[in-house]
Amino acid sequence: MIAHLRGTLLSKQPGQAIVECAGVGYDVAISVPTFTALPAEGAEVRLHIHTQVSEDAIALFGFLDREEKRLFERLITVSGVGPKLAIKMLSGLSPERTVAALRAQDHASLTRIPGVGKKLAERLVVELKDKLDDLIAAAPAAGPVAAGPAAEDVLSALLNLGYQRPAALKAIETAVEKDAAAGEDFDLLFRAALKLIR
């Protein structure tokens, strides 16, 4: 099993990175938080790897942060959560927000993630809420989960545009503080946050 890769980052895009090690290019699935934290293409990168072996394929899932990998591996222990859905979850909500939502039994935040319905959200909470003490500390209440339904989508959009997570979070929170209604409307919040982040 591959547990760690160190090599040259040949290419990156949301959801995927290709890392060359000793002349071999490894196709690695990644979350949005990992994508936004990767160095420039051509730089050396180190990834913690989870290897998933199936009958017809071997898939690699990579993480810059060891804690994110541990949370990913905890998520896939839940029935109905495969590696691809776990990556979507960590992209739709940051690892910190995922832990916070599970601990708070916040089904609404979990069901905003594509592929996570009400029953799966309930199962995630039941199976994991007491198994997170050794993982990432829950994020404070302020931020996208508390800022309104559009906040997570706007955060994801800003990260995909290349903005750093702390700056994006601050812009979203400031926009909602100025106009609470912005938290309910993606277009309104996105435009407001974009003006603030620039």
UniProtKB/Swiss-Prot annotation:
Residues 146-198 are annotated as: Domain III. Its main location: cytoplasm. Keywords: Cytoplasm, DNA damage, DNA recombination, DNA repair, DNA-binding. Residues 141-145 are annotated as: Flexible linker. One of its GO terms (cellular component) is cytoplasm. The RuvA-RuvB-RuvC complex processes Holliday junction (HJ) DNA during genetic recombination and DNA repair, while the RuvA-RuvB complex plays an important role in the rescue of blocked DNA replication forks via replication fork reversal (RFR). RuvA specifically binds to HJ cruciform DNA, conferring on it an open structure. The RuvB hexamer acts as an ATP-dependent pump, pulling dsDNA into and through the RuvAB complex. HJ branch migration allows RuvC to scan DNA until it finds its consensus sequence, where it cleaves and resolves the cruciform DNA. This is Holliday junction branch migration complex subunit RuvA. The lineage of its organism: Bacteria, Pseudomonadati, Acidobacteriota, Terriglobia, Terriglobales. The gene is ruvA.
